[in-house]
Regions:
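Active-site proximal helix-loop segment of RNase H-like, two-metal nucleases, encompassing DDE(D)
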Residues: 76
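Cell-wall polysaccharide-cleaving catalytic domain and substrate-binding groove, primarily
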Residues: 54-73
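Catalytic cores and adjacent binding grooves of peptidoglycan-active enzymes
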Residues: 5-7, 23, 46, 62, ...
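Intrinsic-disorder/low-complexity peptide segments enriched for small residues
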Residues: 34, 38, 53-56, 124, ...
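Active-site acidic/histidine clusters and adjacent loop/turn architecture
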Residues: 1-52
Length: 172
């Protein structure tokens, strides 16, 4: 029997989400594809999407490290908008929040952006619901533009943070 971990399969669309990128952009081990399917479906349903109105995800292939063996995936867009654009919207909302003097206004601003911003919501869903790799001596393999402020491993290098400013990376 072949090693199940060596078989690479595309990340499949779910009921409430669609993979909009070509299948070869996310050829992963079955374990990673299944974990992504579970988390993406839960994220999509919680964000209000369904079979009649699915959310889209766009993957791009990576070329180093875990990507070489299908153990890592990079998500570049959710809902047709790039992760970098979602991050820019998040930062703009927080800048507006810093100008708010009223604690109630603060809660409204952060709450509204947290509901609207699919990039941030996706990062938090991947963080909360996924089981990602953590090689000995290394951080949990979830990186993206929110890692320094929201991530499970906030003390990452500038180089690593900069490399993941426009996408979310997970590995299993």
């Amino acid at each position: 029997m072949a090693d199940e971990g060596a078989t690479r399969v595309p990340v499949a669309s779910g009921k409430a989400y669609r993979v909009a990128s070509p299948p070869e952009h996310a050829l992963e081990t079955r374990a990673l594809a299944n974990e992504l399917h579970k988390v993406l479906e839960r994220f999509a349903v919680e964000a209000g999407f369904n079979e009649r109105n699915p959310v889209s995800f766009f993957f791009k292939p990576g070329v180093v490290g875990h990507h070489k063996v299908g153990r890592a995936a990079d998500i570049y867009a959710v809902g047709g908008i790039g992760i970098d654009r979602w991050k820019k919207c998040w930062d703009q909302a927080l800048q507006q929040d810093h100008r708010a003097m009223d604690p109630q206004q603060h809660c409204r601003i952060v709450g509204a952006e947290g509901k609207r911003n699919l990039g941030w919501r996706l990062y938090k869903a991947l963080q909360g619901y996924g089981r990602w790799a953590q090689p000995y001596g290394y951080p949990i393999q979830l990186f993206g533009p929110w890692t320094r402020t929201e991530g499970p491993w906030q003390y990452i290098s500038d180089r690593l943070l900069n490399a993941h400013r426009d996408h979310i990376h997970v590995a299993k």
